[in-house]
């Protein structure tokens, strides 16, 4: 697996890889200087078939985005149960960093894909929601809105697949923010929503894993 600091890549490579990724494109449009901060704390990964991108049990603060290829998620110890597939455009790795937990699954580059290209950003640079000394409010809001949307989408998928499950409607009980936008108050609310949604998604995963074992 090849890993390269993103800020060391050529501008052409950065533009070709991130130009079509809405999150990074919006980050650049918000503030090119803050975008450079992201680049300095991000890495580009090229994983060949069968190579491990994330290993269950490891502890880190990386937030991942799949740009090209396909990844397969395996659960269990050892990682033998295929539980999900990650396709281009998806965010992953957010639950562990939100809940401050070890990685719960192993993610491997699909053996049917020639190469999988991933960008990962060190989420520790975001600090606590009220800490605006490094990453500024607009960029934090962009990332947290994206994570909340991603988590709600994953939970909606589970709801559609298992409509009679006891967890099916729980994510809809997590209150949306109704106050002034583009404020620290909104950011704090998004952080709270993200943690609750991540916790619920973990509960879903555990429940479905138990069901598979029975």
Q: Where are the predicted features?
A:
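Cytosolic regulatory regions built on CNB/CRP/Popeye-like sensor folds
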Residues: 1-214
């Amino acid at each position: 697996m090849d890993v390269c600091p993103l800020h060391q890549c050529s501008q052409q490579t950065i533009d070709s890889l991130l130009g079509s990724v809405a999150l990074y494109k919006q980050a650049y449009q918000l503030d090119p200087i803050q975008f450079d901060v992201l680049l300095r704390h991000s890495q580009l990964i090229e994983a060949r078939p069968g190579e491990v991108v994330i290993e269950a049990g490891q502890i880190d603060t990386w937030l991942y985005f799949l740009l090209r290829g396909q990844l397969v998620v395996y659960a269990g110890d050892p990682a033998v149960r295929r539980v999900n597939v990650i396709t281009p455009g998806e965010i992953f790795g957010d639950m562990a960093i939100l809940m401050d937990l070890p990685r719960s699954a192993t993610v491997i580059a699909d053996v049917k894909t020639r190469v999988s290209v991933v960008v990962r950003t060190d989420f520790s640079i975001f600090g606590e929601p009220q800490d605006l000394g490094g990453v500024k409010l607009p960029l934090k809001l962009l990332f947290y809105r994206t994570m909340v949307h991603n988590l709600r989408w994953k939970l909606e998928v589970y709801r559609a697949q298992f409509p009679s499950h006891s967890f099916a409607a729980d994510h809809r009980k997590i209150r949306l923010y109704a106050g002034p936008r583009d404020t620290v108050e909104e950011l704090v609310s998004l952080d709270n929503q993200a943690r609750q949604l991540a916790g619920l998604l973990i509960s879903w995963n555990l429940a479905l894993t138990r069901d598979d074992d029975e």
